[in-house]
Amino acid sequence: MKVIKLEDLLGTEREVDDGNWVSRRFIMKDDNMGYSVNDTIIRAGTETHIWYQNHLETVYCIEGDGEIETLSDNKVYQLEPGVLYALDKNDEHMLRGGSKDMRMVCVFNPPLSGREVHDENGVYPADLD
């Protein structure tokens, strides 16, 4: 069994800061669970282009506010605590932080190795290992 405290991830290689967001990576590929779990803060007032061509992601908002826009149809969905979205079609999207930082629990399949950052197209590489 694994028990992981957020405070133990802070300032380690499992905390990745991209400027618009900071991701604390609880479960990663090397944990051999078949998925990864991140606690991610989307900073207020930011906009991030994301297109997970190699991963499926489910995201649950637990704090703050913002919005997600799917670029294939320009639909905008408001995000607030209690809202979950699933990028089940590798949806290209814009993620926007609202008036305050937004905290999200993110699950990826296949799992992240932990070193991923978005490329110029908003994509994580298929596998860094």
Curated annotation (Swiss-Prot):
Broadest EC class assigned to this enzyme: lyase
Superkingdom, natural source: Bacteria
A GO molecular-function descriptor: ectoine synthase activity
EC numbers: 4.2.1.108
Pathway the protein contributes to: Amine and polyamine biosynthesis; ectoine biosynthesis; L-ectoine from L-aspartate 4-semialdehyde: step 3/3
Sorted UniProt keywords: Lyase
GO BP: ectoine biosynthetic process
Protein known as: L-ectoine synthase
